[in-house]
């Protein structure tokens, strides 16, 4: 299966990409019955954020199974410190051309934990990624981690697809900032509708994508 790479200007696969099913739909990566609020993608939250996320009560964060929403290889990862808490950032490349990411995920599955042994750190506020060599394939529905977050416990999936209209908003982040989608649209319909109905952060239900 091809891996998508960024050359500083554009994304391209290292082989012929497969077509995706229409409509393209993810498996919801977490138990929606435990989600207490939604963070909408494409809004300012201490700076512009192209990603959104799920929020959980802290009592659930230590027992939250996180599953891969679609099959694809883990291609980049980072370990970093936020305060005194170690955080893990994971990037997955879906063969048909999507990227998604998880941040603040912990209790990693054994095979992902083993793959991340090549990463040095963690370092405070340094989330620069390491490319996985070789990439690690993770099947749809496979467990990625078993807990999430720092208070107030968030996990952030970031789905990447061309959206040139907003490129100027992300002048310093050509790799991911020029691309984004409303990930609610790619969840099973009932879960996407629930995300839209849940309470939000102080920024509310504003989004350049949704």
Give the role of each language-model region.
Residues 69-131:
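Zn2+-dependent peptidoglycan hydrolase active-site motif and core
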Residues 129-134, 184:
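Low-complexity, serine/threonine/proline-enriched polar segments
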Residues 55-57, 103, 159:
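Residues in well-ordered beta-strands of folded domains
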Residues 1-89, 93-96, 137-143, 179-180, ...:
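Surface-exposed, glycine-biased beta-strand/turn segments
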Residues 8-10, 15, 32, 155, ...:
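Short linear motifs in intrinsically disordered/low-complexity regions
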């Amino acid at each position: 299966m091809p891996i998508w790479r960024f050359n500083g200007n554009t994304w391209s696969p290292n082989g012929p990409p497969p077509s995706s099913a229409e409509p393209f739909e993810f498996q919801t990566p977490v138990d929606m019955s435990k989600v207490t609020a939604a963070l909408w993608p494409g809004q300012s939250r201490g700076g512009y954020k192209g990603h959104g996320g799920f929020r959980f009560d802290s009592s659930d964060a230590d027992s939250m199974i996180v599953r891969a929403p679609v099959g694809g290889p883990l291609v980049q990862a980072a370990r970093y410190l936020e305060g005194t808490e170690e955080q893990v950032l994971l990037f997955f490349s879906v063969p048909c051309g999507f990227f998604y990411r998880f941040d603040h995920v912990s209790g990693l599955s054994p095979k992902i934990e083993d793959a991340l042994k090549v990463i040095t750190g963690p370092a405070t506020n340094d989330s620069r990624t390491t490319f996985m060599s070789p990439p690690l394939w993770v099947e749809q529905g496979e467990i990625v981690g078993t807990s999430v977050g720092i208070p107030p416990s968030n996990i952030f999936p970031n789905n990447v697809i061309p959206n040139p209209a907003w490129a100027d908003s992300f002048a310093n982040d050509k790799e991911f900032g020029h691309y984004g989608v409303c990930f609610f649209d790619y969840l099973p319909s009932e879960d996407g509708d629930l995300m839209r109905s849940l309470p939000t952060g102080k920024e509310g239900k504003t989004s350049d994508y949704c």
